[in-house]
Every structure is written in structure tokens, then in C-alpha cells.
Amino acid sequence: MKVIFTQDVKGKGKKGEVKDVPVGYANNFLLKKNMAVEATPGNLRQLEQKNKAAEAERQQEIEDAKKLKEQLSEIEVEVSAKTGEGGKLFGSVSTKQITQALQQQHDIKIDKRKMDLPNGIHALGYTNVPVKLDKEVEGTIRVHTVEQ
């Protein structure tokens, strides 16, 4: 019997997958526990529509990420930090400080965990910080660290 899985079933199939399973297994387990539905032409059409909608949504997310990447490449974020002798920073500039400055100066909100800056910024001047905007789209933020 062909079924469409409505959720992941370990060892059998993933959500949205269409598979042939034994009739008894389908009737007594998968269908009873709402883990799958019978693969009728109507259900298959519905699954296809869901997949198309999900693909369109995914394309829109990628498009938005590309626009944000373009926007980020044109701007500069200024972060001020306390310094000691010789222009050395006390501590470092973290991704949290960069996201706050980006929000205040340019009204752009980015999650700090998407920035690839493991040790922070330890010097005055310009630094390019890589940002993972999407699985497929990566941009950079130009950060200018100035003396407070």
C-alpha cells in the first residue's frame, strides 16, 4: 500500500515522503497513529501543492537574504570601545555589541549567532565580519572600531 508520511518514522520514511509499505503495517500502525495517510490522487496533489508553496517560500527567503547582503555591503557600523595605552582595547568588541550598533545605526536586525567572529575584535580600525544570512547566502559587515 502506498502511503504519504505525515511525520518522520524511524527506519521507514521521512515527512512528506511517498513509500510502499505492507498493508497491515499501514492500516494497523501508520494510519491509526496518524503517522501517514493513504496515497490517493487527491492527497498526492495536496502534497505537491505543499511542496510548491514551500519551494516558493524558500526562494523568497533566499531573495531576501541576497537583498540584505547587498544592503550590508554598502554600510559601515561604528562601534566605540575603551582603549588603553597604545590603542589597545580593554577586552574585545563582541558580536552582541555589533548587532546592537547595527540595529541603532541602520535599523537592521541580525542574530548575533549568525556572525562568524569567534574571538571578537581586539584592535581599533576596520574589520570585515562574515555573516551567515542563509544556508546559501553569506555576507560581510564592515565594522569600524573607534576609541571611546
Curated annotation (Swiss-Prot):
Which keywords accompany this UniProt record?
Ribonucleoprotein, Ribosomal protein, RNA-binding, rRNA-binding
The family database entries (Pfam families) matched by this protein are listed as:
Ribosomal_L9_C (PF03948), Ribosomal_L9_N (PF01281)
Gene3D superfamilies for the chain: Ribosomal protein L9, C-terminal domain, Ribosomal protein L9, N-terminal domain
The Swiss-Prot or TrEMBL record annotates one GO molecular function as: rRNA binding
Report any one BP term from Gene Ontology: translation
Q: Which GO terms describe its cellular component?
A: ribonucleoprotein complex; ribosome
- Top-level taxonomic group: Bacteria
InterPro entries named among the record's database cross-references = Ribosomal_bL9, Ribosomal_bL9/RNase_H1_N, Ribosomal_bL9_bac/chp, Ribosomal_bL9_C, Ribosomal_bL9_C_sf, Ribosomal_bL9_N, Ribosomal_bL9_N_sf
Q: Which family does it belong to?
A: Belongs to the bacterial ribosomal protein bL9 family.
Role description: Binds to the 23S rRNA.
Give the matching NCBIfam families.
L9
Could you identify this protein by its name? Large ribosomal subunit protein bL9
Task: Please name the source species.
Answer: Staphylococcus saprophyticus subsp. saprophyticus (strain ATCC 15305 / DSM 20229 / NCIMB 8711 / NCTC 7292 / S-41)
Its gene name is rplI
